[in-house]
């Protein structure tokens, strides 16, 4: 393990506490925002800025920047290759025309549709708080994506269209806080669903569902001595662990993640932009909690 106590030892672009506070106190609007936060929120912000803790990669502004397939297509492709258990390359980011309710959109960190080079499609979501009825909801959006693919291929190929042209549609969902059903399996963080018959008959039904419970992964990893067993677990560690010692371990075992952290810490040099990300996250978390409480009350 690297001998280091603070992430600044690995990433010298990280600013000091004094530099951050000096920048905040130079601008009245930044000072007003900073002191509008609770004391524990100010501490969390400074810890994140100064390397006392890692950045929370599931913050909307960070995740979308680091995993943006238009900026760095290999990153999302590499992650999805580990999720699917086979090498894939992202060819296109498709327009996401799926109709969503406003309250649902507020619960999503990432909602992106990508096409692989072999024509398969994946809808990738990151949810801060898992929705109620995750199976029914996923089925509806998978059906919508499948219908969109059918219409697109039919329009492109016209009389040459065949249903054999339909490629698998994957719905891949990462939960930061998993729905209660997932806690019935406290040792399993990745669940794959497909359609099978009760007779053994095999048909190609092009809908697959993969759910990854990050909170269950984190607890399981901690119980196993914080080991990183494979490259998928390396990605999940990157997404959900912000302890410096875990980041050091990840960098030692998988040094290719250094470039991702460097991108994030370059973003963090913009104190005003970072405060906007943090303020937005605080507001959206309050909205998510209120929405979850409303949905629970309706059950």
Q: Language-model segments: which ranges?
A:
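Elongated, amphipathic alpha-helical interaction scaffolds
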Residues: 1-298
């Amino acid at each position: 393990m690297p001998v280091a106590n603070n992430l600044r030892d690995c990433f010298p672009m990280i600013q000091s506490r004094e530099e951050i506070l000096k920048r905040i106190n130079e601008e009245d609007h930044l000072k007003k925002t900073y002191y509008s936060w609770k004391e524990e929120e100010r501490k969390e912000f400074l810890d994140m800025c100064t390397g006392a803790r890692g950045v929370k990669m599931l913050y909307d502004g960070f995740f979308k920047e680091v995993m943006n397939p238009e900026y760095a297509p290999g990153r999302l492709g590499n992650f999805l290759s580990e999720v699917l258990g086979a090498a894939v390359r992202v060819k296109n980011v498709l327009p996401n025309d799926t109709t969503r309710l406003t309250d649902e959109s507020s619960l999503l960190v990432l909602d992106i549709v990508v096409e692989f080079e072999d024509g398969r499609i994946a809808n990738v979501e990151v949810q801060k708080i898992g929705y109620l009825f995750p199976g029914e909801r996923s089925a509806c959006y998978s059906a919508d994506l499948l219908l969109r693919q059918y219409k697109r291929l039919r329009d492109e190929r016209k009389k040459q269209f065949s249903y054999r042209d339909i490629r698998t549609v994957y719905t891949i969902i990462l939960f930061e806080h998993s729905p209660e059903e997932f806690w019935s399996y406290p040792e399993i963080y990745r669940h794959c669903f497909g359609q099978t018959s009760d007779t053994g008959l095999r048909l190609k039904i092009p809908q697959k569902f993969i759910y990854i419970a990050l909170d269950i992964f984190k607890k399981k990893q901690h119980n196993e001595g914080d080991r990183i067993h494979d490259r998928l677990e390396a990605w999940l560690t990157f997404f959900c662990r912000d302890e410096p010692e875990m980041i050091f371990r990840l960098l030692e075992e998988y040094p290719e993640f250094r470039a991702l952290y460097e991108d994030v810490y370059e973003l963090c040099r913009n104190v005003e932009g970072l405060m906007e990300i943090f303020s937005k996250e605080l507001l959206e978390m309050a909205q998510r909690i209120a929405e979850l409480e409303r949905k629970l009350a309706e059950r």
